[in-house]
Amino acid sequence: MASFRKLTLSEKVPPNHPSRKKVNFLDMSLDDIIIYKELEGTNAEEEKNKRQNHSKKESPSRQQSKAHRHRHRRGYSRCRSNSEEGNHDKKPSQKPSGFKSGQHPLNGQPLIEQEKCSDNYEAQAEKNQGQSEGNQHQSEGNPDKSEESQGQPEENHHSERSRNHLERSLSQSDRSQGQLKRHHPQYERSHGQYKRSHGQSERSHGHSERSHGHSERSHGHSERSHGHSKRSRSQGDLVDTQSDLIATQRDLIATQKDLIATQRDLIATQRDLIVTQRDLVATERDLINQSGRSHGQSERHQRYSTGKNTITT
C-alpha cells in the first residue's frame, strides 16, 4: 500500500488506455479512489499555494471560478462520503448487489452511484473550465471598459464647464437686456428735458419781446402824456386826445396778454421742475440698483474664481 501511494497518476493508468485523459472510477477500487483523491488533494494544495502567490495579479472573475471549482470538489467528497456511509449501514455478511466483477471488497460504493458521481464530476469539471475561460475573456475586456470609465469623468467635467459657461452667457444677456430697459426711460427723460429746455428758451424769447413791447408802449404813453399836457395848456383838439386814449387802451390789452403769457410760462416752468425732480429720483433709484447688481456680480465672479481654483487644485 505504501509503495502504491508513491505512484503518480500516469503510472496508475496505462498509456494505451482509452480513458487516460479522464480517470474512470469504474475500474478502480475504493482504496485506489482514496489514494487518487489524496494525490489530487496534494496537487490542489500546490496549485492553491501558487494561486495565493499570484493572487494580487488575478482578476475577481478568475477567483470566482476557483471558488466554483473548490465547491464542486467538496460536493464530490460529500457524494462519496454519503455513499460510503450508506454502504457501511448494511450487514457485513450480505454481498452488495450491482458491483463490478473483480472489484475490491473494501469498495462499498455501488456501481450506479460510482457512475453517477463520475459523470457529475466530469460534467462539473467541463462546466467550471468553460466558466473560467469566459471569465478570462471578460477580464481581458475589462481594461477597455476601465479606459472608457476613466474617460467618462473628463467628459462629464467638460460638459459641466460648458453648462456653466452657457448659464453665465444667459445671465449676462439678461443683465444686458435689463440695462437696455433701464437706459430707455433715462433716454426718454433726457429727451423730455431737452424739449422742456427748448420751450423755456422760447418762452424767455417771448418774454423779452413782450418786455420790449412794454417798453415801447411805455415810451408812447409818456409821449402821449407830454402831448396831452401841451394840449391842455394850448387847449388843442379832442381828436388827438381820443387817439391817445385808444393807443393807451391797446397798450393795456397788450400788457394783459403779456401777463397771461408770463403766467403760462410760470406754469410750464413749474411742470418742468416737477418732471425734473421725478427724473432725479428715478436716476437715483437706477444708481442704487446698479450698485447692488455690481456688488452681486462681483460676488458671483469671486465665487466662480474660487470654484475654478478648487477644481484646478
From Swiss-Prot:
| Record region (Disordered) | 1-238, 290-313
Keywords for this protein: Cytoplasm, mRNA transport, Nucleus, Phosphoprotein, RNA-binding, Transport
List Phosphoserine occurrences by residue.
234
Biased segments, Basic and acidic residues type: 34-60, 81-92, 142-168, 199-226
Motif residue range(s): UAP56-binding motif (UBM) = 22-40
Sequence ranges of Polar residues compositional bias: 126-141, 169-179, 304-313
Gene Ontology terms, MF aspect: RNA binding
Query: Region (Interaction with DDX39B/UAP56) spans which residues?
Result: 1-119
Q: What does this protein do?
A: Export adapter involved in mRNA nuclear export in cancer cells. Binds and enhances the RNA-binding activity of the nuclear RNA export factor NXF1. Can restore mRNA export function in cells compromised by loss of mRNA export adapters.
According to the record's subunit comment, the protein's assembly and interactions are: Interacts with NXF1, NXF2, THOC1, THOC5, DDX39B/UAP56 and SRRT.
**This protein's name:** Leucine zipper protein 4
Lineage, opening ranks: Eukaryota, Metazoa, Chordata, Craniata, Vertebrata
